[in-house]
Amino acid sequence: MSELRDTRLEKARTLEELGQGPYALTFSPSHRMAELQVTHADLPKGEERDVSVSVAGRVMTRRVMGKLAFFTLADETGSIQLFLEKAGLEAQQEGWFKQITSLVDSGDWLGVSGTLRRTDRGELSVKVSDWRMLTKALQPLPDKWHGLADVEKRYRQRYLDLVVSPDSRETFRRRARLVSGIRRWLDQRDFLEIETPVLQSEPGGADARPFETHHNALDLPLTLRIATELHLKRLVVGGFERVYELGRIFRNEGVSTRHNPEFTSVEIYQAYSDYVGMMELTEQMVSAVCEEVCGTTTITYQGTEIDLAPPWRRATMHELVQDATGLDFNGFSSREEAAAAMTAKGLHAPELADSVGRLLNEAFEQAVETTLIQPTFVTDYPVEISPLARPHRSKPGLVERFELFIVGREHANAFSELTDPVDQRQRLEAQQARKAAGDLEAQGLDEDFVMALEVGMPPTGGLGIGIDRLVMLLTDCPSIRDVIAFPLLRPESRKGEPPSVE
């Protein structure tokens, strides 16, 4: 590899000596590749069109055949063949054919001008009359046919992955369209996006361990946000009846194919709504954005057809667990009774699950979650695991909460929001006690948030959707690292250590 780099460095010096320069300042292409292909699709084989064009892009392949050469030049929209003829180039400037064929390598950025012709094989080509080196690449590209076989290298050197993989480029185009589609859908319905703090003195809104940092000037310990929930609710208190934020969240947790410590979510709050209203919003928005991005609401994920057309299935957590295990958690009077019944069914009942409600959630995660392939709203969660949700209007011990599962993964989480400040304080104090006892993921007591609730928050529905997992679904990607341009990876110097997997 070092010999190839040295050779390319020498070519860069030669270009400098010839007055070309290996790194141009600007170039003004007249067309992009896709535009040329569409506009001149009617050009017959073997014919030329006396139309002057200029294009720019990266040289992907090159073939030199005596007095002829053929390069493939690619920009973001597509590619086109360059037809280089010694006689034509030498007529423009002596030595040009030799220079372009000997000094230009695959990977270089090139700007060319010329006319159009279609080869006898039907390939639309630019017959080059003028060329300019835009950037001399010192490193070679991966093999054209095999790309980056090393999956980890694709993540570490995403720029190479994007150069050689049209599928990777399309994944990130779809991600961008999905994000803009969600914002557009919400904006058209009078939701207002407002940015909330990333640095916080009291993290809240989720059960998660935060990243910690320190503000030197104020001598103040801070954390990166683990959710946007509590600040968005403050905005509802302040009078913004439809508000959302789409942005980055940070949780100091393990990594897996479904988890990255830095990820993207959208949280949405709507006054005068509840969790039923947020179910309707979720299925309408996700299906609409899916159709916009994919052209259909029926997609295939890892070989399984998924139908995202509303309405989606709705089922309570109790119903799903009872159907899967035969256990009726409504009939258990103590934690010990529930744990014994779970053990008899071959389910694990961890000591940290210290109530019937927490054990119900454990049974759901072990026996049900991965079976929910088609879109399913799982509703009515135990109050113990939902400290920010409103008590259920008719089911004691439960809250008005749902999670959306597709292909066995959680994609969204929503509540009828808790607006009673006295109840909220009691629940956060219980969380604070768990935190003091060593639960690193328990929430603390945010006094200012409770004060905001005392000012008064109207009935509100709240929703959070994981953007990365939704992109995985719509791009048929098996790992979250495939849809995050630059995922967090262990330093190469520590690659031999066992992975930290959640």
Curated annotation (Swiss-Prot):
EC number per UniProt: 6.1.1.6
Subcellular location: Cytoplasm
Annotated catalysed reactions: tRNA(Lys) + L-lysine + ATP = L-lysyl-tRNA(Lys) + AMP + diphosphate
One GO cellular component term: cytosol
Pfam families: tRNA-synt_2 (PF00152), tRNA_anti-codon (PF01336)
Biological processes annotated in GO: lysyl-tRNA aminoacylation
First-listed, main subcellular location of the protein, grouped into a coarse class: cytoplasm
GO-annotated molecular function: ATP binding; lysine-tRNA ligase activity; magnesium ion binding; tRNA binding
Keywords (A to Z) from UniProt: Aminoacyl-tRNA synthetase, ATP-binding, Cytoplasm, Ligase, Magnesium, Metal-binding, Nucleotide-binding, Protein biosynthesis
SUPFAM superfamilies listed in its UniProt record: Class II aaRS and biotin synthetases, Nucleic acid-binding proteins
Binding positions (Mg(2+) 1): 403, 410
Cofactor note as given: Binds 3 Mg(2+) ions per subunit.
Cofactor: Mg(2+)
PANTHER family listed in its UniProt record: LYSINE--TRNA LIGASE, CHLOROPLASTIC_MITOCHONDRIAL (PTHR42918:SF15), LYSYL-TRNA SYNTHETASE (PTHR42918)
Family label: Belongs to the class-II aminoacyl-tRNA synthetase family.
Subunit and partners: Homodimer.
Alphabetized HAMAP family for the sequence: Lys_tRNA_synth_class2
Name under which the protein is recorded: Lysine--tRNA ligase
Species, as recorded: Synechococcus sp. (strain CC9605)
